[in-house]
Amino acid sequence: MADQRQRSLSTSGESLYHVLGLDKNATSDDIKKSYRKLALKYHPDKNPDNPEAADKFKEINNAHAILTDATKRNIYDKYGSLGLYVAEQFGEENVNTYFVLSSWWAKALFVFCGLLTCCYCCCCLCCCFNCCCGKCKPKAPEGEETEFYVSPEDLEAQLQSDEREATDTPIVIQPASATETTQLTADSHPSYHTDGFN
């Protein structure tokens, strides 16, 4: 059993139908009927001395589980067992994306764009370094202010000078100290609402 060659992944999507003895356009009722008939025939309880029957029963169960699930059956019909493997690895919603990106024309497009942009150096320079470290940066349209960088030290100095100019009169009275009994406003009266949430 260990010397046996591993089964290769098919792309035709027909072998599960052959396991159940059906053709590719079988309905879900046909699949159920064929599964019941073959499951009774190859069930391990009915064939206790036949290990091939147990293996055949496992294949029948696998075929039934895949062909009765509408999403898995659709993937199997389009891409075969390779599609089921991809769905298991990357998720059922990503199967089409995987096969599109692994097609010859997607790979050729990727290589062509790489050659056109000097191994994507142009994209890296434009996106990461703002076109030659800002030297080739696109000009802002007329009438719009250009954004520029202000260092935190310059910003702090500007804020301090604005505060000095805005406060002409110094504050000469210290605020009163607060304690636990100090109220936030002078005209409010304390209420503890102990009489039924008024």
Swiss-Prot record:
The modification Phosphoserine is found at S8, S10, S12, S15, S151. The modification N6-acetyllysine is found at K56. GO terms for biological process: chaperone-mediated protein folding; exocytosis; negative regulation of neuron apoptotic process; neuron apoptotic process; regulated exocytosis; regulation of synaptic vesicle cycle; synaptic vesicle exocytosis. One of its GO terms (cellular component) is chromaffin granule membrane. It is linked to Ceroid lipofuscinosis, neuronal, 4B (Kufs type), autosomal dominant: An adult-onset neuronal ceroid lipofuscinosis. Neuronal ceroid lipofuscinoses are progressive neurodegenerative, lysosomal storage diseases characterized by intracellular accumulation of autofluorescent liposomal material, and clinically by seizures, dementia, visual loss, and/or cerebral atrophy. CLN4B has no visual involvement and is characterized by seizures and other neurologic symptoms. PANTHER family: DNAJ HOMOLOG SUBFAMILY C MEMBER 5, DNAJ HOMOLOG SUBFAMILY C MEMBER 5 HOMOLOG. Acts as a general chaperone in regulated exocytosis. Acts as a co-chaperone for the SNARE protein SNAP-25. Involved in the calcium-mediated control of a late stage of exocytosis. May have an important role in presynaptic function. May be involved in calcium-dependent neurotransmitter release at nerve endings. Oligomers. Homodimer. Interacts with the chaperone complex consisting of HSC70 and SGTA. Interacts with ZDHHC13 (via ANK repeats). Interacts with ZDHHC17 (via ANK repeats). Interacts with SYT1, SYT5 and SYT7, and with SYT9, forming a complex with SNAP25. This is DnaJ homolog subfamily C member 5.
